Amino acid sequence: MKKMMILSALALFSSSLFAANLTLQKEITPQIVNGEGVTLQEVHNGNRIELKPGHNQIAVTIGQIVFEDGKRRKFDSQPLLLEFVAKPEQALTLEYGKFRTIDDAKKFENNPTVHLTDAQGNPVAFTMVQLYKGGLQGFRDYEREVADYNAQKAQKADSAPLVNHDPKAMDLKTAFKEMTRQEQQAFMQWAMQNLK
C-alpha cells in the first residue's frame, strides 16, 4: 500500500515536472485545452497554463477594449482553435497584435493572426481555425463546439486544409508567388523530378 501511494505521488509529480508552459497575452483567454474546459485554478499567475508534452489543441478567445465612435466598447473574438506540438519543459508564448478601434478588431475577426513562439522568440509551427457561430451568442458551449469540430474533421479527412503557420512553408509560398511564370514552371519541373 505504501509503495502504491509513493508511485501515485511520483506519477503526479513527474507529469507536471515535464509539462510545457504556455503564457498567453493578457487579453487572450483559454477556453479549452485538449478537449477539456479550463478552470481558473488551471490558469497560473501571468496567464500561464500547463500543457502536456506532444500534440496539444487549445481554443482561445480574445477580449479587448476598443474605441467605436469615440466610446469604449468590449470586443470578444470568435474562438480560435490552435493545434501544435509542445516539447517537454518547453516555454511557449501566444500573442497577437493589439487593436485600438472596432475597425481593427473587425479586420482581425476576418483574418485572425496570432504568434506562437518559444522562449528564444523563435516561431513555433501551428495550425489554426476560427470556430464561427452566427446569431445570438449569449452563452457558448466551447467544449461542444470543439468536440463537434473534431468529429467533423475526423469524418472529412480530405476537407479544406487548415491555415499553416510554419515559417519555412510561408517563406516558400512567398518566394513562389514572387517568381515569374517561367521561373515558376522551372521550379515545378524541378520539384516534380525531386519528389520523394
Curated annotation (Swiss-Prot):
Coiled coil: none
UniProt keyword list: Signal
Pfam family, one: DUF2057
Keyword Amino-acid biosynthesis: no
Cross-referenced InterPro entries: UPF0319 (IPR018635)
Signal peptide: 1-19
Protein's UniProt keywords contain Signal: yes
UniProt similarity note: Belongs to the UPF0319 family.
HAMAP family: UPF0319 (MF_00789)
Protein name as annotated: UPF0319 protein VV0948
